């Protein structure tokens, strides 16, 4: 109990109850004042943080943009006529351009709902010089690395003899995008992030030549601190260490100057696509990849980032279900080249790429099947991740089992899922039960009814959040990577994954799916119909702008 200070002799002059009550009111007033002070400090800290300043500068630019028509109101008639003509021209242009119909519909909605703002913003977006620079630079880097990504024709001949449909996918990935098909590659599947973390620590300790790491999210904690200590030690042993992470981390996960901190340890570090306080569409194209390459012999891909929730050391949305794959052998060469292409985007000149490639194995191990590491870029007009998913759905004979954290679909993917189910293929999708983004979950649920009535089975992972991005089919085909079933992953982000065929580890992917399914709740049409009105309305409204989510 807090001591009550009462002036000497006061009890004889004043009511003790009033004295105590006065003291309580004074203490309450002090607490309220303290709360207000803390709130003010938090507010100013938020406003003057990097994220706060970024938002303020963006808002200023938008206000200037919106204020221009007001100051030109005396020319309103002329401007209105000109903008009406421009609106029609832009709408005709949108209709006749190539691209996903969902994106085109969203742009048309913006232009028609807000003629002046929508029209000018569309023109501004499609004149982005920075986007064109990155697009041209990536194309040039692909040409430079092409000699190191040659396809062994003996491998493709064997694949044609084994399964011609997968050989067609192999041809597309190799000839159109430069991602060869490999054999002689061991595959190890990890059903949770903890297993991948334990394996990665062991492999990093073995590094002798170089370590390349590229991740979307990095946050200080048990996972990253452990890895960082190994990286620092390896630098002292003469190992070349390069570390790249997405610029979104500078918002609230890492200081903006964090690359300089790592560089002091001898680690070559950079942020990809830094966040800048200017209205620019390239800031919408995040580096969502998860790649780790060790000595060109060992590589990791999957959904696991470098933060404690991915290994369940920190609970955010119940149990965090994620997956990853280790590759050991020839196929790691593709991961090396994918990393170096992204690393060199903002650099001049060409690296001696050959020094990072290892000699391919001469002996052939038929038991290991076929492995195709692949990557996706928003600037090459090829939706690689989506094409891989379409391929699996269109060529399945028995089943396609899917794990994804998000379900925001265009009409083509929605139709393909339902067509597969109506063709007698067992299509099951596992979604989170505890979402990380309520708005994305609300949009996902707007697809449930149509999918379920079309024969697709939907389950929700009741222990928590599914972050895995997995397709597995017919006991012989699987893909694991960073690519979600949403517009951002399929069209806007830099992504990567690995396609696996005729490898024993595919069975383990399916076993993990069945084990996860046993912990899930099956969603019914009745359940979908009975969900809250607020979530229904929110989902339907947000679906109008789904391509932006």
Residue spans for each PLM region:
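Residue-identity detector for glycine
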Residues: 9-12
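N-terminal localization/anchoring segments of enzymes in phospholipid and broader phosphate metabolism
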Residues: 5, 17-387, 391, 395, ...
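Conserved, well-ordered active-site substructure
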Residues: 471-473
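Thr-Gly-centered strand-to-loop micro-motif
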Residues: 403-404, 431, 461, 480-481
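Short, small-residue-biased leader/transition segments that mark boundaries at the very start
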Residues: 1-2
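Helical hairpin unit composed of two closely spaced alpha helices linked by a short loop
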Residues: 406-425
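Extended hydrophobic/aromatic segments used for targeting, binding, or gating
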Residues: 412-415, 429-453
